[in-house]
Amino acid sequence: MLTNPRSDRVRSVHGLGRRPVRERTGRFLVEGPQGVREAVRYAADRVVDLYVTSTAAQRYALDIVQPATAAGLWVHEVSDEVLAAMSDADA
């Protein structure tokens, strides 16, 4: 479980909220269950990592986490604090 909201990985994900970072890396951040569900279902080959809290992992196990795992995606469990730090919201 990722618990350090100041880690390099968390900073990298948070950086995707800025246009220059998205343009440089060619990556973007999808947030919310509907967007993530659709990305896993229809574009799993383009998903790099999936970050979920333990609560979200349980709530969306059947329609997001299990299909992501079956598609060979990296699913990382993170604390609520880490997810907030990754978000584009100023946490």
Tell where the protein language model's regions lie, with residue ranges.
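N-terminal positively charged helical leader segments and presequences
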Residues: 1-90
